[in-house]
């Protein structure tokens, strides 16, 4: 059965992993239009200098009460993510008929030109919270771009 998914929620990563060739960028929760199922999609960026051919991540999805709905590994295989490329947002790592409230992500291993790189020892560095734009500026920006989600001061996302 074909079904379309629409964006329910999107959250950027609140940290980066200093020195890692791969950065976690955001998590998106999408809702199926016919079944109501929630798909969890993760987005990553190759910030290294070599093509990324694979990535293994560990994720944990929780409900509003903090109960674990799913904990598993996901394998992004046969990638050809060149330096600077963003990937993963079109792969659902988990589909649930129960609402998902939070997702925790840990990067495990990257494959750069087939060579495995352990990502578990890279330290997380917390990012500053986005600053909210004054209402009039946000409204003007939204009108000019046609994007109502533009409510915060743009941040440098180059790591």
Predicted regions and their residues:
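Low-complexity, acidic Ser/Thr/Pro/Gly-rich terminal tails and inter-domain linkers that flank the onset
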Residues: 1-43, 47, 121-158
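Intrinsic disorder/low-complexity detector
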Residues: 4-6, 48, 65, 74, ...
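Short acidic/proline- and small/hydrophobic-mixed sequence motifs that coincide with surface turns
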Residues: 50-54, 69
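Hydrophobic beta-strand segments
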Residues: 56-57, 74
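Conserved aromatic beta-strand anchor motif in extracellular beta-sandwich/beta-rich domains
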Residues: 59-63
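Short, solvent-exposed, Trp/other aromatic-anchored flexible loops in extracytoplasmic proteins
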Residues: 64, 68-137
């Amino acid at each position: 059965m074909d079904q379309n998914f629409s964006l329910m929620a999107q959250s950027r990563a609140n940290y980066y992993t200093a020195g890692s060739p791969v950065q976690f960028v955001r998590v998106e929760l999408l809702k199926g239009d016919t079944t109501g199922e929630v798909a969890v999609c993760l987005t990553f960026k190759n910030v290294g200098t070599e093509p990324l051919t694979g990535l293994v991540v560990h994720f944990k999805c929780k409900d509003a009460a903090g109960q674990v709905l799913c904990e598993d590994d996901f394998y992004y295989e046969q990638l050809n993510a060149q330096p600077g490329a963003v990937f993963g947002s079109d792969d659902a790592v988990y589909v649930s008929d129960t609402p998902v409230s939070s997702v925790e992500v840990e990067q495990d291993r990257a494959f750069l030109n087939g060579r495995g790189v352990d990502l578990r020892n890279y330290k997380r560095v917390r990012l500053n919270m986005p600053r909210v734009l004054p209402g009039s500026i946000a409204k003007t920006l939204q009108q000019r771009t046609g994007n109502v989600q533009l409510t915060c001061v743009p941040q440098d996302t180059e790591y």
